[in-house]
């Protein structure tokens, strides 16, 4: 269960980061059962943009999707890296109108990001990370060529009104270079799991140094 305010915060945080305006066309590619479908479908009315509802058969066809993006003038596309890999496996399509590609749902391999930037240097590449339990995206990272030289792409910085912590099992902050678990606090953190209080109690815990009643995921 997530709050309406968390989902709205996710939508609003994308507007300044991606510099969205009434000139944009957002591709709605996700199933209605997935969290990312909410922002894909509902963010555009916030700033007067257009939503292009992509047919399911096209949304899962790498080359068909790119052709659709070009034909419909789509400016913002979110996709999983495995589909992006298929997009780059064949001849290039111009994508003159696309402004942003947001890989999400899987870890984006640095080499794949490198290949994308080589083919489409004019299209901004933003690594989007976030669990459904926290109202979709909680971090963005603008990928450039330098960042593709590492073993992993960074998760990035928190989205508006969310906070990220790297913590140990005792919920203590770990020092730089140490291994820890990524924990999320802020507006995006949901209520918990429906009819599963035990799982909720294990995953949504009191924030050890937050405001009274605040929780971490």
Please annotate each region the language model reported.
Residues 1-3, 7-10, 20, 26, ...:
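A generic "structured core" feature
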Residues 46-51, 74-78, 88-154, 160-163, ...:
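Gly/Ser/Thr-rich phosphate-binding loop
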Residues 20, 30-34, 57, 107, ...:
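Conserved AMP-binding
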